[in-house]
Amino acid sequence: MAMFSHRLRRIVVAAPSYFQRFSTLSRPSDFTPVPSLLPRSVVKQSTAINRSPARLFSTTQYQYDPYTGEDSFMPDNEGCDFNHWLITMNFPKDNLPSREEMISIFEQTCAKGLAISLEEAKKKIYAICTTSYQGFQATMTIGEVEKFRDLPGVQYIIPDSYIDVENKVYGGDKYENGVITPGPVPVPTKEGFDSLKKESKPEQEEAEIILTPPDEGKTSGQVQGQGSLTLPDQRSVKERQGTLALVQGQGQRSGMSILGQGQGEGRRMSIPGQWQSRGQGNSFQGSFKQSQGTLPVRKGQTQISDEIPSFQGNVKQRQEMPIHGQGQAQRSQMPSSQGTLRQGQAQGSQRPSNQVGYNQGQGAQTPPYHQGQGAQTPPYQESPNNYGQGAFVQYNQGPPQGNVVQTTQEKYNQMGQGNYAPQSGGNYSPAQGAGSPRFGYGQGQGGQLLSPYRGNYNQGQGTPLPGQGQEGQPSYQMGFSQGLGAPVPPNQVIPGNYGQWAFVNYNQGPPQGNFLQGPQQNHNQGGQWNYSPQNGGHYGPAQFGQWYPGPPQGQGIQWPQYQLSYNQGQGTPFSGQCRCPNCGMTSYQGYNNQGQGTHIPEQWEGQDYAVLSYQASYNQAHGAQAPPYHGNYNQATPGGYGQGTSANFNQRFPVNPANYNMQNGGNYGPPHGLAGNPGFRQGFSGQGQNQTFQQDDQRNVAGDLRNNNPVDPTETRKPNSRI
């Protein structure tokens, strides 16, 4: 339908490229042209263009519509008969004539162009406009139109068409022999411009329609309904009683919806992507629920069901990032008295109620905080916050890109990046402390940025570890499964939060990767962690000055007690026991997944594998590529001081890079002076390139021969004290 916008758009579209296509030879104009006062959508013309005389647009050539891409000045446009023409004029901006003066100029220009008297010209003019555009509409032939090209002040000559096809009405103020009847004011619509003023609404009212559900008038505890969708880069935020987005009740929403206190449904903000989430939360302060999405789902849909009661509050933040493929993922309920987050099971795998597992096959949808193939997460919250006390799960996140899973009694203040994994599987070498118990990873093809604090990496050709992604196989606590991943750029964070007993305080600046936190740990980790080489090999973890009892172990790979068992190969699961040859410590839940050309004894004993594992294992792929970076960096800003937790790690300035990863396989020890399983207030003994030295406190000795104590040692527990 030809709208009033046709005429306005024809004025707008005279861009330089179109001028070149439709320009004709002409002489310079005696009238000093300046940019005309056109509506907001009008493209401002260049100086060179304005100095040129009017352009006569050939309707047989012009095809482009900047609004729909389908408009053309062909006779199929209603009213475009090449007998009705719109002629716009360019008036000096610094000396703009009055409306009456403009109308007089229109009449004189029409008379001069047609070489007729002023009275005859008034009969030719059927409409004028001095507001949205400056010009007049007159009836004439194509041959007569040619005469207007060189007239002073004439800007565009365009065939006119109906703005109201049903009533066959042209736009502008109606002009009948000098008598002017104001016409309808054009208003913007999603299709262009509407000419009927009665259908127009103020911009503020339209904005409210976009951002506010129809049931805005209801009370905060009774908000139900659906609203309009907004653009992907917009947000809809509603504040109620001074509290932003605190929901006390249950809600169902699609996209990014922040409701008030009570029950509600809404789609006030929808980032492309389709999912639904439901949840319940009984909280002293409420539960913060946020759904985030990035790329749209091509096939498949994720449904999430969570029930997380907490003593003081629940934080449930989801980021639906399905990769482009097929699949479905469902989540079972996971009650927790301490705010444990339950983030999904994939493809119908069943796990005990105290477990959280991710198992993602090739091409299946990725669970929350999982970065799939090329998926990118928009940035959200930036600043860290402080939260309450006791059995309290809190979550503070910068712009995440990856997977984040949290459980109870943890405090993290992380910085930097760690464990880059390539797009087609790879070997991971976590930083020291990466193997806190009760976690497992199961990865399909590809890799992601993974936190070095948790174990059980299973990366290979889609073969999960036992208990990591197989139906009916339980994992002790948590499992991850990743699809085709994308490299994540490094970031920086601002450490901050300080929590207390049984307090999950996760303070993450702009993290980009997958992070799993487990119980009873305090971590203040900085810098970069280990990176795997392009081809297979055995690599020791970066040393972050953490507390690991026991004597030095062998040479080559030095893995500490209560940490990790490493499995490399092509994803064939193999359950094994990890036993320390010196202290006799056995692995509670470790997995030996061995592949091509790599021989690891069943008991994990020998000079090449001095491995002690408690509840974690790694399963790695063969021939993976990863950036050849080095790990073991410690940042300057300490954080994460807690009470009643099992350990407190504080790192400071990086000194010497450690754990370099090379292009080909091989056995590598931990950083200089950090071989074996050292304990605090002990000498660090090592072999080969490692040296032995004595320190009073090795909490901050990651690749450094100095003793980097925290700013205030009284604020941290002695790392050599056991809980």
Curated annotation (Swiss-Prot):
<feature type="compositionally biased region" description="Basic and acidic residues">
    <location>
        <begin position="714"/>
        <end position="723"/>
    </location>
</feature>
<dbReference type="GO" id="GO:0005739">
    <property type="term" value="C:mitochondrion"/>
</dbReference>
<feature type="compositionally biased region" description="Low complexity">
    <location>
        <begin position="682"/>
        <end position="695"/>
    </location>
</feature>
<comment type="function">
    <text>Involved in organellar RNA editing. Required for the processing of few RNA editing site in mitochondria.</text>
</comment>
<feature type="compositionally biased region" description="Basic and acidic residues">
    <location>
        <begin position="191"/>
        <end position="204"/>
    </location>
</feature>
<keyword id="KW-0496">Mitochondrion</keyword>
<feature type="region of interest" description="Disordered">
    <location>
        <begin position="318"/>
        <end position="474"/>
    </location>
</feature>
<feature type="compositionally biased region" description="Polar residues">
    <location>
        <begin position="273"/>
        <end position="303"/>
    </location>
</feature>
<keyword id="KW-0507">mRNA processing</keyword>
<comment type="subunit">
    <text>Heterodimers with MORF8/RIP1, MORF1/RIP8 and MORF3/RIP3.</text>
</comment>
<feature type="region of interest" description="Disordered">
    <location>
        <begin position="663"/>
        <end position="723"/>
    </location>
</feature>
<dbReference type="GO" id="GO:0080156">
    <property type="term" value="P:mitochondrial mRNA modification"/>
</dbReference>
<dbReference type="InterPro" id="IPR039206">
    <property type="entry name" value="MORF/ORRM1/DAG-like"/>
</dbReference>
<feature type="transit peptide" description="Mitochondrion">
    <location>
        <begin position="1"/>
        <end position="64"/>
    </location>
</feature>
<feature type="compositionally biased region" description="Polar residues">
    <location>
        <begin position="327"/>
        <end position="365"/>
    </location>
</feature>
<feature type="compositionally biased region" description="Polar residues">
    <location>
        <begin position="373"/>
        <end position="430"/>
    </location>
</feature>
<feature type="region of interest" description="Disordered">
    <location>
        <begin position="180"/>
        <end position="303"/>
    </location>
</feature>
<dbReference type="InterPro" id="IPR054059">
    <property type="entry name" value="MORF/ORRM1/DAG-like_MORF"/>
</dbReference>
<dbReference type="Pfam" id="PF21864">
    <property type="entry name" value="MORF_dom"/>
</dbReference>
<feature type="compositionally biased region" description="Polar residues">
    <location>
        <begin position="219"/>
        <end position="233"/>
    </location>
</feature>
<dbReference type="GO" id="GO:0006397">
    <property type="term" value="P:mRNA processing"/>
</dbReference>
<feature type="compositionally biased region" description="Low complexity">
    <location>
        <begin position="459"/>
        <end position="474"/>
    </location>
</feature>
<dbReference type="GO" id="GO:0046983">
    <property type="term" value="F:protein dimerization activity"/>
</dbReference>
<comment type="similarity">
    <text>Belongs to the MORF family.</text>
</comment>
<dbReference type="GO" id="GO:0009536">
    <property type="term" value="C:plastid"/>
</dbReference>
<protein>
    <recommendedName>
        <fullName>Multiple organellar RNA editing factor 4, mitochondrial</fullName>
    </recommendedName>
</protein>
<keyword id="KW-0809">Transit peptide</keyword>
<dbReference type="GO" id="GO:0016554">
    <property type="term" value="P:cytidine to uridine editing"/>
</dbReference>
